[in-house]
Amino acid sequence: MVAAKAKADWIPDRQDIIWIDCNPQAGREMRDRHPFLVLSPRAFNARTSLVIGLPMTTAEYNADNPFALAVGAAKGAKAGKTSYVLCHQPKSFDWRIREASPHRLKRLPDSPFFEVCAVLNQIIQLA
């Protein structure tokens, strides 16, 4: 009962890494359940049920992609592979409907998170 309550109270926050189902997808968009780096703040995510962020992958072809930022080594079944944040694929998802859940990595450390934001800003040029 306590675990169910904890999950019911959970709301993703900026810098969290979560699991989310990216389906449906089209073209070169990511599909299926993947890690996702949250960019939007907890208050926004709670109020709107949306989460804005970037998908993550261990697909090796991203090593040559200037917009895929390597953020460390994967763990678990993907141990030994590099984790990439796909800065060129910002997305918003209804995290409640898609039954998002916390990823075992929990949160991206400050330094790589700031690098991800800098690469994203090179693309969308907010500031």
Predicted feature residues:
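Conserved functional hotspots at enzyme active or ligand-binding sites that engage polyanionic ligands
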Residues: M1-A127
